[in-house]
Amino acid sequence: MKAIICGAGIAGLTLAWHLERSGWEVELIERAPAFRGSGYMIDFYGPGLQVAERMGLRERLRALRYPVDELSYVDRDGRQTSHLTMPPGMQEVISVLRGDLARTLQDDVRSPVRYATSIDSVEQDSGGVTVQLTDGTRRRADLLVGADGAHSRVRELAFGDGSRHLRYLGHQVAAYILEDRRLSERIGMRYQMLTVPGLMAGAYALRDDRLALLFLRREPEPRIPGDPAATLRRHYGELGWILPEVLTRCPDPPELYYDQVTQVEMERWSQGRVVLLGDACQAVSLFAGHGASMAMAAAWILADELAGCEDPVAAALRYQRRIQPTIGEVQRFGRRFIRWMAPAGRRHIIARDWMLRLAALPGVSRLFVNSLSPGGHNLIRSSSEVASPHPA
């Protein structure tokens, strides 16, 4: 059988890896002009890490990890107001750049990626699916997988108006990386953040004297500004800490990542021989902090259902039934976490800082950190294990 996968991000690459090894022919297309090595730090754990283990990638990801085990909040003068240190003995968390994870996956995928290409039209019949690509070619396959992100073109073609599936969470996010040895050494291997009502700015050091910046802004209007860099300077330039300095060197897109914070909610993830994967159908948002892990888990489950099957339409429905309830749980967690990560008022910031101080007490930190972890830790079981009343 053959699958066309639209989207060569974490979800699409993970699915390609598994389908190739179960005998499928895979064609990967990606609308970006080249591999995207950008993105912010992700804390990779739980089901995604279990999938990486099954793929033989865990040790390679460990070699790329950043030893970030402290979250520190500072004021406008850079003085620490509260902090949280990861207690020993917790489940393994690998802090890694999204681009490093994607590169690790792509290095092990056999199928080449056709870049600067998307889909113009989709036609289905009882025997397969035919797509018209933006380069003018037509391709046919047994299954089309839309793994092309929250603003999915495949979703729009198969399900109609794509925006109706988006749940805007009232915030916009930006991220970029700059080289600065002095600031990188000052921040060190920890997440350091400054929060004022409606605005959050964070920084963490990377290898090679680089510094990563992350910005989160409360914004009722979902429209992306025409000049994102100028928008960041206008809102954050007077907040103190390291912000005036780093914002003078803020690049323009694409070096500057800027987007809405959204979730994608859908009743159905497939339409015949077209199935959605990753953020195209299950975006959990930055607030949930579990997107890459859930994307890899979903790809593994879809591949598990497709392996050896003769009916990809039925396999797509089984895949949705296995993971959609967990995605809903993680999305609800993300919406609850907004008031913690992006406090709307001063009293919310004070309450959060006091909670962090309490969490530092002996015996409390483990309970507190566990409360910040969404579900999904029992997802990675084969279809035979799911069907068994006594899974191994």
For each feature predicted by the language model, list its residue ranges:
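Flavin-dependent oxidoreductases
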Residues: 171-204
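Short beta-strand micro-motifs enriched in acidic
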Residues: 124-125, 204-208
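Conserved N-terminal helical subregion
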Residues: 3, 18-20, 45-159, 163-177, ...
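Residues at the starts of beta-strands that form the adenosine-phosphate
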Residues: 2, 25, 210
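Hydrophobic residues embedded in beta-strands of well-ordered beta-sheets
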Residues: 129, 200-201, 210-211
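Conserved mid-domain beta->alpha element of the FAD-binding
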Residues: 6-32, 145-146, 174, 232, ...
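C-terminal helical "tail/cap" subdomain of flavin- and related membrane-associated enzymes
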Residues: 1, 288, 304-392
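FAD/FMN-dependent oxidoreductases across multiple families
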Residues: 186-187, 196-199, 206-207, 215-288, ...
